[in-house]
Amino acid sequence: MSDKETIISLLNEFANPKKMASFFVDNATPDFLFIRPSGNPIDARGFEQMVSGDIVQEKAEITKIHRFEFLSDTLVMCIFTLGSKFTYKGTPNDDLPTVTSIFKKVNNVWKIHWMQRSTGNSDLSLWD
């Protein structure tokens, strides 16, 4: 599998509702941060606790990859739209956020190093 295929496979694993909670614990660098729509950061364990507690993830899928760029042999930036249907503290959400992610190759293994999620519904036509 090529590096690009490996990273896309990781993204699809992240989008699996059954694996989403533990995904970062299993696949992130030790200094990983997820920046929530509020702008507040959370680490891998914090994300796992949040998704396991307040969020009931019904559906998630990588809708479209807008940009995939090797910044070096060990760094990749990927910007994608995530279709996400979930309930947060009893409130249903059907979101289409844009997500920026940075992957880092550590000891020859690709790990997620950074992820930032936008709010609400992205206008996919603006990416064309």
Predicted regions and their residues:
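Solvent-exposed, amphipathic alpha-helical segments
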Residues: 6-17
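Generic short beta-strand segments
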Residues: 79-86
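Short beta-strand edge/turn micro-motifs at domain boundaries
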Residues: 96-126
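A solvent-exposed, acidic/Ser-Thr-rich amphipathic alpha-helical stretch
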Residues: 4-6, 20-74, 80, 93-95
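A short, structured loop/turn motif at beta-sheet edges
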Residues: 68-76, 103-110
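C-terminal and inter-domain tail/linker signature
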Residues: 44, 85, 111-114
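Outer-membrane beta-barrel domain signature
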Residues: 88-90
